[in-house]
Amino acid sequence: MKITVLLCNMFHVKHCYNKYLVYHNSKWDCKFFLNYKENINNESYIKEHLSSELKIPMDCINLKYVTSKIHEKYSESDKMNKIYSHKFYLADIVDFSEIMKKDVFEIDGRTYYWMSMSELESDQNVLKKNSDIINYVKESF
C-alpha cells in the first residue's frame, strides 16, 4: 500500500489556490506527489515524515484522509503488471517556511515544485509515468 499526500498550496496570492507540492524523483526522473509506504500509524507516520522532510513543526500539519484506490498497472521497473493500492491524504500546512513559498525550492538535496494540475498534465514525462494518479487526483479533488 502506498500513501499519497497532497499538499495544496494556499499561502500566497502569487501562487493562488489549486497548486500541489510535487518532488523530483531521481530514480524515475519524474515529478511525483509526496508518497510513503503504508504504516500502521499512517497519520503520525506521515506527519513525522512531512515535518522532517520539509523542516516544519509537526503541529503545523493537519491531515485529512480523503479516499483510496486499487488498480492494476504495468511496472516499468519490474516489467510486469502489478496491483497498486493507494490511500490519499490532504495535508494542510498552517505555517509555511519562507523557502516553501517559492515556486521551486530544495531541501536536503531534494527539489520540490508547486504545480497546478494543468502544469502536471502538460508534462509528458509525468503523464507517461504517472497518468493514473494524476487523473485520479484530478477526479477526486
Model-identified regions with their sequence ranges:
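Acidic, metal-coordinating catalytic segment for phosphate/diphosphate chemistry
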Residues: 1-10
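Short, solvent-exposed loop/turn segments that connect beta-strands within catalytic domains
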Residues: 13-19, 78-81
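Conserved Nudix-box catalytic region and its N-terminal flanking loop in Nudix hydrolases
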Residues: 15-56
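Conserved beta-strand termini and adjacent loop/short-helix elements that scaffold enzyme active sites
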Residues: 23, 64-68, 115
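Functional cleft and adjacent loop/helix regions within the main domain
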Residues: 28-39, 73-79, 104-107, 140-141
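Active-site segment of metal-dependent pyrophosphate-handling enzymes
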Residues: 51-100
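NUDIX/MutT-family hydrolases
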Residues: 85-140
